[in-house]
Curated annotation (Swiss-Prot):
Belongs to the gamma-BBH/TMLD family. Its cofactor is Fe(2+); L-ascorbate. This is Probable gamma-butyrobetaine dioxygenase. One of its GO terms (cellular component) is mitochondrion. Fe cation binds at H222, D224, H376. InterPro entries: AlphaKG_dependent_hydroxylases (IPR050411), GBBH-like (IPR012775), GBBH-like_N_sf (IPR038492), TauD-like_sf (IPR042098), TauD/TfdA-like (IPR003819). It is an enzyme of class 1 (oxidoreductase). The gene is gbh-1. Pathway: Amine and polyamine biosynthesis; carnitine biosynthesis. Catalyzes the formation of L-carnitine from gamma-butyrobetaine. It catalyses: 4-(trimethylamino)butanoate + 2-oxoglutarate + O2 = carnitine + succinate + CO2. Gene3D superfamilies: 3.30.2020.30, Clavaminate synthase-like.
Length: 421
């Protein structure tokens, strides 16, 4: 379903005026009454035909019936014409299938329209809006926990903020009540299980399996689980009991830092985007599963570049955790010194005041952030007597979070909604 506003805008200028082709390149040219034109590959029109023999469309599933093994990619049209009464393009194919393409359908999907292509790329919920302290301080998006739990528009807006800024906060859950993480997780979708379980607790422990549990001192900036080949993409923490003093949350946008290094320290940027680091994590954690205490032993090992680029050279992942960094460097010994200099410079940039966001989670607050974009830490703290600083948390993957955003855009008929087929 498209938003009513988008449909109305398109309909106002979507009267089909003419159709020509297919030409020798198997292209069909369409013109609308507003002067806009469309260039449609003939085979694409057959493949995307919105008819029951081509697609199964139901509340439970949208899927193409055609199989590529049997699909004739050279098939032709017997005839094509504009049905003026229905304002649609009709094509009768050699196979006997009749396709009907409404004017709005064609305009939204017009492969030769740069605006249509730009709009479609937004379905991936990129690009991010990177930030330093000046851009995010005082502008961090915060939402009511109560409204999040009962209003799907707030769920959408909260998750959309995380997609854009990489972070957002829920305020005011019932204080000291366990189960908030699970309840929020149910509103978002499926929580991602790790070797720390489905939902974990962060507090000081004598037999700590993680640096966050081992000391009340400050921690270094890091992303979680660089020791995994596929680290969780988002992390959430809920404050059950805050510290009497200290324990502030600190975040830095790794994408923003990477772009600073690209401009200011290109030699450092090159090392961090080409040299993989090895991370290890050995130990055990204890889980309660179906009323039984289960010890899970693990020996994790993975390699990541600190800054990963996509095919277009854009930063799309940050992965760094000094506590889990191993001794192994898969490069010539003469290059190791430069690798250390690069890690040092990256870390110093993270700690520059211009890059850091600092705030305090109060009891009942929850923060969700992009674990492969933002680095996080906390400063040292002091507990009140008999009131240990305690958080619960979990992880998510982007597929679940972004699926929820797209689903709600469809369900709520929001302006940003886009067709699935």
């Amino acid at each position: 379903m498209l938003s009513a506003l988008l449909i109305r805008n398109i309909r106002n200028a979507s009267k089909l005026a003419s159709v020509a082709g297919p030409n020798s390149d198997r292209i069909v040219n369409v013109k609308w009454s507003d002067g806009k034109t469309g260039v449609f590959p003939l085979i694409w029109l057959r493949d995307t035909s919105p008819d029951p023999s081509t697609y199964t469309i139901s509340p439970a599933m949208t899927a193409r019936k055609l199989t590529m093994l049997e699909f004739d990619v050279e098939q032709n049209a017997r005839k094509l014409w504009i049905d003026e009464d229905a304002n649609c393009l009709k094509i009768e194919w050699e196979s006997g299938v009749l396709s009907e393409f409404p004017s709005e359908w064609l305009k939204i999907r017009n492969p030769s329209d740069q605006e249509a292509r730009r709009r479609r790329r937004k379905v991936y919920l990129f690009p991010e809006q990177t930030w330093g302290k000046a851009e995010i301080e005082g502008k961090l998006k915060k939402f009511s926990h109560e409204e999040f739990m009962k209003n799907e528009q707030v769920v959408h807006d909260f998750l959309q903020a995380v997609c854009i800024d990489g972070i957002a906060v829920l305020k005011g859950a019932p204080q000291g009540v366990r189960g908030a993480v699970e309840a929020i997780g149910d509103r978002i979708g499926m929580i991602k299980r790790t070797h720390f379980g489905l939902v974990f607790e962060v507090s000081l422990k004598a037999d700590a399996s993680n640096m966050a549990y081992a000391s009340n001192g400050g921690l270094p900036f890091h992303t979680d689980f660089p020791s995994l080949s596929h680290p969780p993409q988002l992390q959430m923490l809920h404050m059950l009991q805050s510290a009497e003093e200290g324990g502030h949350s600190l975040f830095v946008d790794g994408f923003h830092v990477a772009e600073q290094l690209r401009v200011e320290k290109p030699e450092i940027f090159k090392i961090l985007t080409t040299q993989s680091m090895e991370y290890i994590e050995e130990g055990y954690d204890v889980h309660e599963i179906n009323g039984k205490t289960i010890r899970f032993d693990y020996d994790m090992c993975a390699r990541h570049k600190v800054i990963r680029l996509n095919d277009d050279g854009k930063v799309n992942k940050i992965q760094f955790g000094n506590a889990m960094r191993s001794w192994f460097y898969d490069c010539e010994p003469s290059k190791v010194q430069d690798v250390y200099r690069a890690m040092k410079t990256f870390t110093e940039y993270c700690y520059q005041p211009r890059n850091m966001l600092k705030f305090r989670l109060e009891d009942g607050d929850t923060v969700l952030w992009a674990n492969q974009r933002l680095l996080h830490t906390r400063d040292g703290f002091r507990n009140a007597p008999e009131k240990a600083r305690t958080l619960t948390g979990c992880y998510f993957d982007w597929d679940i979070v972004k699926s929820r955003v797209r689903f709600l855009r469809d369900k709520l008929s929001l302006e940003q909604n886009q067709p699935s087929a």
